């Protein structure tokens, strides 16, 4: 027998190298075979419910790292709630209608207008479902636990029917109406867009300063006066029908030197404008309030048949321009709102493709709107006072990445103004994480206009509206309920397969159709109405779910997207929000803080991460970042996370190895019988348990990450395990000292494995497979540990905190001795602590082997007054370090005066000799193979 065989060296097959890319799919297959999702639901049946409603990702293309952040975050919450005693069914969903799928088919050569519509829509459907399957596999590869066999998809007939029922309820309350208001118009998509489909980019535009000649000054301005206006969209001058001034703003009539014209500009902008216009000097002729100029008539710059009325508007400011806004009601929301008060013509001079229409005039007809600035400049002639290029934020179609325009076209709207205050009241009742989300959503709802819900596309849910012979729109509850039932049985495809009369209730009549003839709407619904009614199609429709949901979790862009649309529809129909709480997350940027894009080559694919590092590394990254703000990720960052993971894994591996001979049923030592340092570690660990449980409750994953890393690296690796191994290796296998520490090891191992399962499910499942004494087949079926408190715990923590300070001081003294070549490693040291009475009292109260804790072979405690001048001194304590006296025990590696060669060929100290002689009589009788001496 060899001497080292008398040591209790930990043994385990748990590998140091994780091999996650290969092992994770195996665990996922095992979970699926065991149907763990269903088992967890059955286990928690009848317990308090928690419902997180999944915001549906768009079913197109591979998932990106933003999807991963979102789905992993949800999975962490679902898993932590499930293991904390809640019934948490989680139904994943997909958004499957909309323009992007049409665009994909177009790129594949599919020509929609040359096909039978039903065939085209079936192609859209099949493509969408193929993307659902692809993304489902991607999400499952990330370890996301969900009801994957029963997801919701917005193209499902039942979902479409429930969506129609939401529309019908809103229509029944009078919230759906048709109007020709200006809407965001995408010429590249040939469709109206909702606010949520807009993104902003900075662009350069040519802005023009020009003047309208006064035609009727109403006795205030004479006809030789010109009102100066500014525009950043020259094409809209073709539809300008008014000039808006601020009612309380001051305007001056000035005559530049050498000019026979006089001009009206805002007083607050005159100096800057004079410089732009080259007015070296000017004479001020009069001053007027904006309200005094109301109803003055001016001439259109080139169309003599058009008069432009001076009107009043509160949206006019002195931030830029001239303080006078040219007003084209067909091309802007403010223009429309103020223009309709004065009954100005709502002229639209750009068609659906962005081309100037015939009513713009022969010089413009057929030209692309963004290319007509030179024509406008030419038409203005000497009325043009200045032009300049400005850089400003401009709206773009989020899908095509092309600029859009405001354009008044007949559209269907969902009113927001009719019940805006009700929505705002519901926001006040909702909990937000982070808290600033409340203000953000509140302001968006407060300031938003009505919602344009119609789209001039094919792939989507049809608007269930019919028209009588006299043009009356029909969307009564009877009709929409009937359409909903048809969709539920046949899918929305039936809308395109049947004539209007066959889609209406049998025997339906309407006074507007004396001949019984009807037509149907050909527009479809905004896809945000699809997902925005999911509270009805999912949470309210499934028996195992509930409405309102406990939580909606999405990116911060969804304040103007899904959070917004869901809130509007839910309050409109039922008077309350669809959620009790909202958690929003920032965007995922690259390692330099830049937006990810194919052109930059900085996109991180979750699939690539899973192949290189494993999904658990990506999951640990999610837990490591502050998602309240934008977060950064790169392969380098993931490499750093992987290194942290390695430290956690290897520490837990040490615990597995050193509890391999520990049976909790027979070997556990009661807390009261633990050693002082073991009690301290138990208390510290239970504080960690409390921190983690609280952080899960608050969805604060970063706190969990930091707390676990600190506990593993500082409390365990750098302190407790650093000296505990000398006990568990050296002491007799069944000794009280060893079993005490193993009790703490095992308690930490089992509980931290459970606590980390929501974040690292593959790794903890692997660890769990080595914990043969635990009853649950899978750790996911276990319950989260509760934090315990202990008597005198605060006093214990205070005492050990003081010791940690002393330990740091002692380590400094040992380091100085090491540098002076007095010792090599700390076990070569004889440390003398010169202590004040207070420090002596502390060391006595700790009731511990201080030499063991400081990892020195010999320790002496002396009076502080006896400290030599060269001692390493601190307040109340000083240290000297000498080389320990004696020989190195081959078994304990400590220097001990009692170390000597024994009769059984072992060069060991008395303590090790006693252990050997009591526990290895055969070796004592036969002698060890080699002594090393």
Swiss-Prot record:
It is an enzyme of class 6 (ligase). SUPFAM superfamilies: Anticodon-binding domain of a subclass of class I aminoacyl-tRNA synthetases, Nucleotidylyl transferase, ValRS/IleRS/LeuRS editing domain. Catalyzes the attachment of isoleucine to tRNA(Ile). As IleRS can inadvertently accommodate and process structurally similar amino acids such as valine, to avoid such errors it has two additional distinct tRNA(Ile)-dependent editing activities. One activity is designated as 'pretransfer' editing and involves the hydrolysis of activated Val-AMP. The other activity is designated 'posttransfer' editing and involves deacylation of mischarged Val-tRNA(Ile). It catalyses: tRNA(Ile) + L-isoleucine + ATP = L-isoleucyl-tRNA(Ile) + AMP + diphosphate. Belongs to the class-I aminoacyl-tRNA synthetase family. IleS type 1 subfamily. A motif ('KMSKS' region) lies at residues 595-599. The gene is ileS. L-isoleucyl-5'-AMP binds at residue 554. Its EC number is 6.1.1.5. PANTHER family: ISOLEUCINE--TRNA LIGASE, MITOCHONDRIAL (PTHR42765:SF1), SOLEUCYL-TRNA SYNTHETASE (PTHR42765). It is found in: Cytoplasm. This is Isoleucine--tRNA ligase. It comes from the Bacteria. IleRS has two distinct active sites: one for aminoacylation and one for editing. The misactivated valine is translocated from the active site to the editing site, which sterically excludes the correctly activated isoleucine. The single editing site contains two valyl binding pockets, one specific for each substrate (Val-AMP or Val-tRNA(Ile)).
């Amino acid at each position: 027998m060899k001497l080292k065989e008398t040591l209790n060296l930990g043994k385990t097959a748990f590998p140091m190298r994780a091999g996650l890319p290969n092992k994770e799919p195996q665990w996922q297959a095992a979970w699926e075979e065991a149907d763990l999702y269903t088992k967890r639901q059955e286990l928690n049946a009848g317990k308090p419910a928690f419902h997180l409603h999944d915001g549906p990702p768009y079913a197109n293309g591979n998932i990106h790292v933003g999807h991963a952040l979102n789905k992993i975050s949800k999975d962490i919450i679902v898993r932590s709630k499930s293991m904390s005693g809640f019934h948490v069914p989680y139904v994943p969903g997909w958004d499957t209608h909309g323009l992007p799928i049409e665009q994909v088919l177009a790129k594949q050569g599919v020509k929609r207008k040359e096909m039978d519509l039903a065939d085209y829509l079936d192609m859209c459907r099949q493509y969408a479902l193929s993307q659902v399957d692809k993304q489902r596999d991607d999400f499952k590869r990330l370890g996301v636990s969900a009801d994957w066999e029963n997801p919701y998809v917005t193209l499902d007939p039942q979902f479409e029917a429930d969506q129609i029922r939401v529309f019908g309820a809103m229509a029944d309350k009078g919230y759906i109406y048709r109007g020709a208001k200006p809407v965001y118009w995408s010429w590249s998509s040939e469709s109206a867009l909702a606010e949520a489909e807009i993104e902003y980019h900075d662009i350069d535009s040519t802005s023009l300063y020009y003047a309208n000649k006064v035609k009727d000054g109403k006795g205030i301005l004479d006809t030789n006066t010109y009102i100066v206006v500014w525009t950043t969209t020259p094409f809209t001058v073709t539809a300008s029908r008014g000039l808006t001034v601020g009612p309380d703003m001051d305007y001056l009539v000035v005559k530049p030197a050498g000019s026979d014209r006089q001009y009206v500009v805002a007083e607050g902008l005159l100096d800057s404008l004079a410089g732009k216009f080259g007015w070296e000097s000017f004479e001020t002729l009069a001053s007027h309030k904006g309200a005094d100029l109301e109803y003055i008539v001016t001439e259109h710059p080139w169309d003599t048949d058009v008069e432009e009325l001076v009107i009043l508007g509160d949206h006019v400011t002195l931030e830029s321009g001239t303080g006078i806004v040219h007003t084209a009601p067909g091309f802007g929301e403010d223009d429309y709102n103020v223009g309709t008060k004065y009954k100005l013509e709502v002229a639209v001079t750009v068609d659906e493709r962005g081309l100037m229409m015939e009513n713009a005039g022969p010089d413009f007809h057929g030209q692309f709107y963004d290319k007509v600035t030179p024509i406008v400049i030419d038409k203005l002639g000497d009325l043009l006072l200045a032009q300049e290029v400005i850089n400003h934020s401009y709206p773009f179609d989020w899908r095509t990445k092309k600029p859009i325009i405001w354009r008044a076209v007949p559209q269907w709207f969902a009113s927001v103004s009719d019940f805006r205050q009700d929505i705002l009241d519901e926001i006040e009742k909702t909990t937000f994480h982070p808290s600033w989300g409340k203000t953000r959503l509140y302001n968006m709802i407060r300031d938003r206009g009505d919602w344009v819900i119609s789209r001039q596309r094919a792939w989507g849910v049809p608007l269930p509206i019919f028209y009588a012979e006299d043009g009356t729109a029909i969307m009564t509850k009877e009709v929409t309920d009937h359409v909903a039932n048809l969709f539920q049985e046949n899918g929305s495809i039936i809308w395109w397969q049947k004539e209007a009369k066959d889609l209406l209730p049998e025997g339906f009549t309407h006074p507007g159709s004396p001949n019984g003839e009807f037509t149907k709407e050909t527009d479809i619904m905004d896809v945000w109405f699809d997902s925005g009614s999911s509270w009805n199609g999912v949470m309210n429709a499934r028996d195992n779910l509930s409405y309102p949901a406990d939580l909606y979790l999405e990116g911060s862009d969804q304040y103007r997207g899904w959070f917004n649309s869901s809130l509007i529809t839910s309050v409109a129909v039922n008077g309350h929000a669809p959620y009790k709480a909202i958690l929003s997350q920032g965007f995922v940027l690259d390692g330099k803080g830049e937006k990810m894009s194919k052109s930059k080559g900085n996109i991180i694919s979750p699939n690539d991460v899973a192949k290189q590092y494993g999904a658990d590394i990506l999951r640990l990254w999610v837990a490591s970042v502050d998602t309240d703000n934008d977060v950064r990720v790169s392969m380098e960052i993931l490499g750093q996370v992987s290194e942290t993971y390695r430290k956690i894994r290897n520490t837990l591996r040490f615990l597995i190895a050193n509890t391999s001979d520990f049976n909790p049923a027979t070997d556990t030592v009661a807390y009261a019988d633990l050693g002082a340092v073991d009690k301290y570690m138990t208390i510290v660990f239970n504080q960690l348990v409390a921190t983690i449980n609280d952080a899960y409750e608050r969805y604060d994953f970063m706190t969990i990450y930091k707390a676990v890393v600190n506990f593993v690296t500082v409390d365990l690796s750098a302190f407790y395990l650093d000296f505990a191994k000398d006990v568990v290796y050296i002491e007799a296998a069944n000794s009280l000292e060893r079993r005490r520490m193993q009790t703490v090891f095992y308690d930490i191992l089992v509980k931290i494995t459970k606590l980390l399962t929501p974040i690292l499910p593959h790794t903890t499942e692997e660890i769990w497979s080595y914990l043969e004494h635990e009853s649950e087949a899978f750790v996911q079926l276990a319950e989260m540990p509760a934090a315990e408190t202990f008597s005198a715990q605060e006093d214990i923590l205070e005492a050990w905190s003081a010791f940690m300070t002393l330990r740091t001081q002692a380590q400094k003294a040992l380091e100085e001795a090491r540098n002076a070549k007095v010792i090599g490693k700390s076990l070569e040291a004889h440390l003398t602590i010169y202590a004040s009475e207070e420090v002596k009292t502390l060391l006595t109260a700790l009731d511990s082997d201080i030499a063991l804790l400081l990892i020195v072979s010999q320790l002496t405690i002396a009076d502080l007054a006896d400290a030599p001048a060269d001692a390493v001194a601190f307040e109340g304590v000083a240290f000297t370090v000498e080389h320990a006296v004696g020989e190195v025990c081959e078994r304990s590696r400590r220097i001990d005066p009692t170390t000597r060669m024994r009769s059984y060929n072992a060069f060991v100290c008395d303590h090790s000799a006693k252990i050997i002689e009591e526990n290895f009589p055969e070796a004592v009788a036969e002698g060890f193979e080699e002594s090393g001496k």
